[in-house]
Amino acid sequence: MEHLDLGPFSRASGTVRLPGSKSISNRVLLLAALAEGETTITNLLDSDDTRVMLDALEKLGVKFKRDGDTCVVTGTRGALPAARADLFLGNAGTAVRPLTAALAVNGGDYRIHGVPRMHERPIGDLVDGLRQIGAKIDYEENEGFPPLRIRPAQISVDAPIRVRGDVSSQFLTALLMTLPLVKTESGETIVEVSGELISKPYIEITIRLMERFGIKVERFGWERFTIPSGVRYQSPGKIMVEGDASSASYFLAAGALGGGPLRVEGVGRASIQGDVGFATALMKMGANVTMGDDWIEVRGVGNDHGKLDPIDMDFNLIPDAAMTIAVAALFADGTTTLRNIGSWRVKETDRIAAMATELSKVGAKVQAGEDFLVVTPPEQLTPNAAIDTYDDHRMAMCFSLVSLGGVPVRINDPKCVGKTFPDYFERFLALTQP
């Protein structure tokens, strides 16, 4: 198996410009494809997940030109041209869920599939919501999971659409982005969410981006959403993808563990991404954090003992960035508890199980529950631990931080970071010193 040996390091400092946000990139690509007019997208992320979205849009007849991190998309005025397509979408939830919804109302014959792990990630709640408006979607293998077959259907909305919110916020995102394309007599469609909506900031991203393309969603708490119906997205002309706040978390943590100053550029106070909340969690752990509109800087730890403070915190709002806290907990002066992270279990891997296994390899005592993780750091990190990454980009990036504990660490299958941040390790190594 291919591997990468890192460290030992004791310092981290410098400045890093973040790649574009994965969540924003794939949303903007689909919105631009559905819009009327031409959209120039800048700072578009170049990664496995954005490539599968672009490949899918190309197969669906969408015209675009890409040059570096700029992509010019010619919109289809709400009707994707291809009446038939077989779409391989890898393990990209940000492509599978929204495209399933968009194609369900497009009137064609489509197949959606991906890597084996994608066929283990649930999509049944989204399919149930789409079937409420007449969509014809069949499961090819296991009920509730891809691969999917989508067929032409008579779509009509005559009652509020109900969708569960406690498994993945991407189900709601997919419905919100698609429903403006469906005409109703009342001129609007209502979506009602059952259960506690997880990852609320990702829904806020969706709503903000839809507004940039001319569609305003009304939100009543997090339980009810009203979407205008039978209207077209309008291109904003130009739109810039802000830096990836989830990716920022690794560098911000490095600035705390390695003394800093370490600055990330591309996200800050003005960000529409919830994962900038990672900076607040890091401050609660005692890190020295300052923030501008589009930058965040960390300068080590501000307490007397020089270690991070342990925390007990609900991470429902920032589940991806919470993974970085789990590894930062190795450097805390006591036991850290991460709560309300049940969504980890249906991500690229079962992240609760994976995190517990790999933290144990470096000496931590870990208690893993259905939706929580309790991490007690060791007196001394175990050197030369070989970290398995489970084809999960975030596992690989998180555990690079172990090298800042003055011990070498081996990352197995390091190229899995290509899903969102292909040159992550080059950037990390440019900021770290023995």
UniProtKB/Swiss-Prot annotation:
Gene Ontology MF, one: 3-phosphoshikimate 1-carboxyvinyltransferase activity
EC number: 2.5.1.19
Cited PROSITE patterns: EPSP_SYNTHASE_1, EPSP_SYNTHASE_2
Annotated compartments: Cytoplasm
Pathway: Metabolic intermediate biosynthesis; chorismate biosynthesis; chorismate from D-erythrose 4-phosphate and phosphoenolpyruvate: step 6/7
Domain of life: Bacteria
Binding site for 3-phosphoshikimate: 22-23, 27, 168-170, 199, 320, 347
Cross-referenced SUPFAM superfamilies: EPT/RTPC-like
Binding site for phosphoenolpyruvate: 22, 93, 121, 170, 351, 394, 419
InterPro entries: Enolpyruvate_Tfrase_dom, Enolpyruvate_Tfrase_sf, EPSP_synthase, EPSP_synthase_CS, RNA3'P_cycl/enolpyr_Trfase_a/b
Listed name of the protein: 3-phosphoshikimate 1-carboxyvinyltransferase
Organism whose genome encodes this protein: Paraburkholderia phymatum (strain DSM 17167 / CIP 108236 / LMG 21445 / STM815) (Burkholderia phymatum)
